[in-house]
A protein has these predicted regions:
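Short alpha-helical
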Residues: 34, 81-82, 107-108, 155, ...
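NAD(P)-dependent Rossmann-like dehydrogenase/reductase catalytic/cofactor-binding core
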Residues: 158, 168-169, 219-311
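Short, well-ordered alpha-helices that flank and scaffold nucleotide-derived cofactor binding pockets
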Residues: 17, 21, 88-92, 115, ...
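Rossmann-like NAD(P)(H) cofactor-binding subdomain of soluble oxidoreductases
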Residues: 53-138
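Internal alpha-helical scaffold of NAD(P)-dependent oxidoreductase catalytic cores
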Residues: 92-93, 115-121, 134-187, 197-238
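NAD(P)+-binding Rossmann beta1-loop-alpha1 motif at the extreme N-terminus of oxidoreductases
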Residues: 1-52
């Protein structure tokens, strides 16, 4: 199986490296030329959970016109706001039989992919793996967690089960799912309680479980998201709050993806996470003051480091 990782940042590089130990042929694609060239020259170094460093030789690409043609699978892990741009770049090298699997954060990604590739070509899922990009060619595995794969709508198909087996062959915990839409909302609720808080404060995920003030803020944001998710047909109980805190603890060494974006002064996925809760809340008449505040603060922070204007 030929697999193209579209969006080989911290998480994409981690999953690509793990999959490279299977029967599959893996290609990493990212516009981060420095990271791609470092891996091409010396392989990808992963600082493992036990502190050891393992090296993975991998094929890398930073130019779309150099990509290998006719991949069997495109694993989409770009930022939500870059989904359509990335698909327009890779779609030209794909065949009618290419399958696209999104494990991205946020809501609406599989629909965006389907607009370009067709709904029948898309699988979706959720992963709790955590990874931090430490520098070109170097990542830290920040936490283990399951990956769920299935059809965007309906029960898990045979093709989804085949990909689950591939992930298991790579020693990644994976399960087929008949409820992908619910899992995507569940991941959204988890991200709501972790990403913006870590991005705004500079802390690692684990501090959310250790600092009472951070825990309380996480709880308030998640409680709003639970109510909004229920209005969309995905009811979660109050135990979801403790689940989010447990995820923060399990990925304690990790900086969330949003935290890493802030560290690098890059655009974040705030609109697809806390901002999505705010939008859906307004549609349903549900107040979301904590998520509104987190969203606004993140936008102010982004504007500070992305704007070319001076006060």
């Amino acid at each position: 199986m030929n697999v193209l990782i579209a969006g080989a940042g911290a998480l994409g590089s981690l999953i690509g490296a793990r999959l490279s130990k299977t029967r599959a042929s893996i290609s990493l694609f990212s516009t981060n030329r420095e990271h791609m060239e470092a891996i091409r020259r010396g392989g990808l170094d992963i600082e493992e959970l036990d502190g050891t460093v393992r090296n993975y030789p991998l094929k890398t690409f930073f130019e779309a016109d150099k990509l290998p043609r006719n991949p069997d699978l495109v694993l989409v892990l770009v930022k939500t706001y870059a989904t359509q741009t990335a698909l327009s770049l890779v779609h030209g090298v794909c065949s009618a039989s290419t399958v696209f699997l999104t494990l991205q954060n946020g809501i609406g990604n599989w629909e965006r992919i389907a607009e370009i590739a067709g709904k029948e070509a898309v699988l979706a899922g959720s992963t709790a793996q955590g990874s931090t990009l430490l520098g070109p060619g170097l990542i830290r595995h920040g936490g283990n967690g399951p990956t769920y794969i299935g059809e965007p709508e309906g029960p898990a198909s045979e093709r989804a089960r085949r990909l689950v087996e591939l992930f298991r062959e790579a020693e990644l915990v994976a399960e087929p799912s008949d409820e992908v839409a619910r899992l995507i909302w569940e991941k959204l609720v988890i991200n709501v309680g972790i990403n913006a808080i870590t991005g705004l404060t500079g802390i690692r995920n684990g501090f959310i479980a250790e600092m009472p003030e951070a825990t309380d803020l996480c709880r308030s944001a998640v409680e709003e998201a639970i109510i909004v998710a229920g209005s969309k047909g995905f009811p979660f109980g109050v135990e979801m709050v403790q689940r989010v805190i447990s995820v923060a603890r399990a990925t304690g060494r990790n900086r969330s993806s949003m935290g890493q974006d802030v560290d690098k002064k890059k655009k974040t996925e705030i609109d697809a996470i806390n901002g999505a809760v705010v939008r859906f809340g307004k549609e349903a008449g549900i107040p979301t003051p904590v998520n509104e505040t987190l969203t606004s603060l993140m936008k102010v922070l982004e504007a500070q480091y992305t704007s070319q204007r001076t006060p």
